[in-house]
Every structure is written in C-alpha cells, then in structure tokens.
Amino acid sequence: MSESFKVCFCCSRSFKEKTRQPPVSIKRLFEAYSRNGKMSFDELLRFVSEVQGERHAGLDYVQDIFHSVKHHNVFHHHGLVHLNAFYRYLFSDTNSPLPMSGQVHHDMKAPLSHYFVYTGHNSYLTGNQVNSRSSVEPIVQALRKGVKVIELDLWPNPSGNAAEVRHGRTLTSHEDLQKCLTAIKDNAFHVSDYPVIITLEDHLPPKLQAQVAKMLTKTYRGMLFRRVSESFKHFPSPEELKGKILISTKPPKEYLESKTVHTTRTPTVKETSWNRVANKILEEYKDMESEAVGYRDLIAIHAANCKDPSKDCLSDDPEKPIRVSMDEQWLDTMVRTRGTDLVRFTQRNLVRIYPKGTRVDSSNYDPHVGWTHGAQMVAFNMQGHGKQLWIMQGMFRGNGGCGYVKKPRILLDEHTLFDPCKRFPIKTTLKVKIYTGEGWDLDFHHTHFDQYSPPDFFVKIGIAGVPRDTVSYRTETAVDQWFPIWGNDEFLFQLSVPELALLWFKVQDYDNDTQNDFAGQTCLPLPELKSGVRAVRLHDRTGKAYKNTRLLVSFALDPPYTFR
C-alpha cells in the first residue's frame, strides 16, 4: 500500500505506507515472556510484575488487560495473546505511565500549606493583559481542567453603585461579578471535591464590599467556609475542606492601619500630621464598619502583599497563618537573599506568586523557582501557551489530577531547611528509551506536516527541576514515517532532587527549510512515574490530549527511589 503526495500540477510522489509493526526490541520482549508466539495469563502476569513493576497485580488485573484489547480480534482461540494483541496493550490507556486519573493517593489530611495548589492568574481574561475580553468562559475551562484557585479583580463600575470584574487601568472589558460567582459554583467540583479558593484583588469601598459579601453568601450558602476563630496554628486540610469554597483577600482597614505610625518615640511633625489624617479616616471607617463586617467575616485566608522592601513579609505569627503574594521579580529577590527563610515560611503560611506586570502577552515564567522554595500557589495565565504552562499542567497531572499535590518531605522538614541553591549528591538515575510512536495519521491530515512527503519526526526530552538536574536530549530523526521507530538510544538523567523533577517530551517534524512543525507534547511528574514500557499520550499546545497520538517509552530508576 502506498501514499501519494502532489509535487506539482501533473506529478506526484508515492511512498510505501508502513504499517504498525512492533519494533525489534518489543518483539524480543514478547518472546522472552511467551512460548511459540503466544502469551498465557500467567506469562502476562509475570511480565506485568517483573517489567512493569506492578508487584501487587493479580489475575484480575491481567483479565482487565485481556478485555482492554479484545476488540482488536488478535487472540488465539484458546484465549492466548499474540504479539499484535500484546503490542496493542502496550499502546493502550490501560498502560499509562501515571496512576489513573481521578485516583487520589496522596495524604490529604495535612494542613493546606503542605500542598502545591493548581492556581490561575486573572482567571477571567480570554487573551492578553491589555485589551482582551473578560468572560466566564476561561473560568469554567480552568475549573474543568482541575484549577483550584481562581482570581477575580473587583472594581467599582462607572456609576460606582456595583462591583464588576475587570483588569484595572487597562483596555480589557469587564464581566458581571454574579456571572463569575455562579460559574465558579457550577464548576468548582467538576474534577474533584477538594476546595476551591477565590482570591479577590479588592479595589472596592466598604459599601460595595458589603454588597459583595451578600452576593457571596447568597450564591455559595453552605459551601462557603468561614473561620471559627481569628487564631489557629495551621490551616485546615484539603480533606476537611472538601466541597468548600474559601475567600482569600486583604482584610478591610488593614491598609490604613498599616499606615498609622506605632512608636514610643516622639513623632515628627510629618508623622503626627499623617496620624491625625489616618485616625480621622479610621473613625469614618468605623461608621461604615457595620456595612463591611460581613465581608471581613467571609475571608477565610487573610492576605498580604510583599512589595515594601522595608517590611518583613516573611514574619511568621504562630497563631495566624496568612497568604502572602509577590510577583516573579520579587520572588527572585527573595530567593537570592532569603531562600531558606521563604522555605520555612511556606511550611505554615501560603505564598502566591504571580507574573510580572510586563507580561502583557499573558506569557508565563518558570514555576520551579516558586515550587522549590515551597510556594503553594504559583499563579499562571491559563490562556497562555508554551513550555512553562506544559510544565505546570504536568505537575498537576499528579495525585489523580485533583488540583492538589502534596509537597515532598524535603520542603516540610522544620529542622533541616531545604536550600535549592545547594548542590546535592545524585540520588538516582532515570533511564528512558523511546521506542516508537503512532496516531499522527489519525489526528492530523496527511499533508499537515509536509505537502510532499510523510513527516520526519524526532523527539526532544528533558528534565525540569532544580538547576543541577535540568538537562535535555533529542532522538534521531525518523525520515518519512507516520509510525516512527527510534529505540537506539537510552537517555540517562542523573537526579539530585528527584522529588521536584518533571520529565517533558516534545515531538516535532523536522523541516530543512523552515521552522520545525509541532507534533505533540506532554510532561510527567517524576514521583508519579511508573516503571516499565508505557504508552505516553501526547497533548496539543493548549494541553488538550490527542485522541490517538502516543509514544511508547520505557522508564527505570536506578537505583529505585522511594518518594513518599
């Protein structure tokens, strides 16, 4: 069978179409666990245990594999598996490199500060930060992808009689606040029952804060989590907060109170003048306090900004854990000057990182800087694209994709603080071999990659993690093949902090004259990675999984490493 490509109006080129044939290495693997070209239940169970590392698998597990490939009609009449059925099993969703989606397997009973949380930035924007449209659509999409922290910017409307959602001081449009709140309510627990946190960037006067409090109370009712005390040593756990929505923002009056000079020395004329003004405003504020008290009482996680260099935003009140926000530039400053202090602070308190203001194109930054210092809420523009977003999506494929990933022990040890800048010894080596891939012929038009020939695929593969572990490689190019076979090289990744490592793949079609064409990507959290030969499903630029396109890859850690 051949495949034809038009070269000009009257000519065409034909290529012999290659079928889905198992690579030689897979054939040898099958032969090692079969007899006379057929594999029995017991032999398949031995393969699953010895090669795939499924030590606790039994005959029920093997029967599920049989059923998963039964429709391929490649069984021996006695129920034995032929090579092609074995090959289809290896490429099936049953053979994923990660635990099944929806299977939460981390301890969810620790304080909220012990988890990385899937976090969005300016969650209502559909595009750039300057003049794009505001809508509930990106909020819905984010929640349905597992995002658990939604940000809303609240401003008075032009009439000053209601709050609206918009990116202030830009040309972006506004969205109705009630629509946003309802969208969150309707989609908050689509992926998992673990809590959703709404971070409010509040630019409202007390009267509108009171109005927002009524909207929140009416919309969420019993779903709304309320603090039972102003003093507590730790945040509640995700398990305790199941089905709850938490509000996080700066409490009213905090700004003015922070401006009042508290000192025992004789104040200057300038300070005295400011104190009089501030105290007068505070008195006026007290008159309106009855209006805003409901708003203040709804704030489950008190927030503070980290913008003033003279203010110690990492001071830890043992009775009042808080959330501190800082942009990526301020994070870099903190990392250089107070890295271990930041790690200590995040053991009890929450830290939210957000993109710097110059990222007007809604691009993103390296999330690992925040994660390696314990920051729980590394906020991303979910409407953006690119490698950094793929890494973010990869991190939260962990723990069943529930939106919460337990931080590794190294970030929670109160006695030996983790220092990401320190050079650690190699703990283990990840060995990866990419055998083959398939599905592009089903997910793409036959001229998508090249008008005149089948595609020339190659794979880039690398580690995202601490600087010492960050490295990448690429395979050779498989020329003119819809079903490329590589498998000659084994890629070795020496890992000093495997707990924070993610493995990324990017497939491209090689083009000699123009930019290489994108052909799929994915990112896998190393602590979740299963050993053995696995089917790695690829995703498009936005993170949506292709229906058919996969790589067949083997993974092994040498020596084996225990993550949790």
UniProtKB/Swiss-Prot annotation:
Function: The production of the second messenger molecules diacylglycerol (DAG) and inositol 1,4,5-trisphosphate (IP3) is mediated by activated phosphatidylinositol-specific phospholipase C enzymes.
C2 domain boundaries: 406-539
Tissues/organs with expression: Expressed in leaves, roots and siliques, but not in flowers.
GO cellular component, one term: plasma membrane
Name used for this protein in its record: Phosphoinositide phospholipase C 3
Residue ranges annotated for the EF-hand domain, each copy included: 19-54
Residues annotated as the enzyme's active site: 121, 167
SMART domains for this protein: C2, PLCXc, PLCYc
Uppermost EC category: hydrolase
Residues of the PI-PLC Y-box domain: 296-412
Necessary cofactors: Ca(2+)
PANTHER family: PHOSPHOINOSITIDE PHOSPHOLIPASE C 3 (PTHR10336:SF213), PHOSPHOINOSITIDE-SPECIFIC PHOSPHOLIPASE C FAMILY PROTEIN (PTHR10336)
Membrane topology note: Peripheral membrane protein
CDD domains per the UniProt record, alphabetical: C2_PLC_like (cd00275)
Residues where Ca(2+) 2 binds: 450, 509, 511, 517
Binding site for Ca(2+) 1: 450, 456, 509, 511
Occurrences of domain PI-PLC X-box (ranges): 106-250
Coiled coil location: none
Top-level lineage group: Eukaryota
Pfam families: C2, PI-PLC-X, PI-PLC-Y
GO biological process: intracellular signal transduction; lipid catabolic process
Organism for this UniProt entry: Arabidopsis thaliana (Mouse-ear cress)
Record's keyword terms, sorted: Calcium, Cell membrane, Hydrolase, Lipid degradation, Lipid metabolism, Membrane, Metal-binding, Transducer
GO MF, one annotated term: phosphatidylinositol-4,5-bisphosphate phospholipase C activity
EC identifiers of the protein: 3.1.4.11
Reactions accelerated catalytically: a 1,2-diacyl-sn-glycero-3-phospho-(1D-myo-inositol-4,5-bisphosphate) + H2O = 1D-myo-inositol 1,4,5-trisphosphate + a 1,2-diacyl-sn-glycerol + H(+)
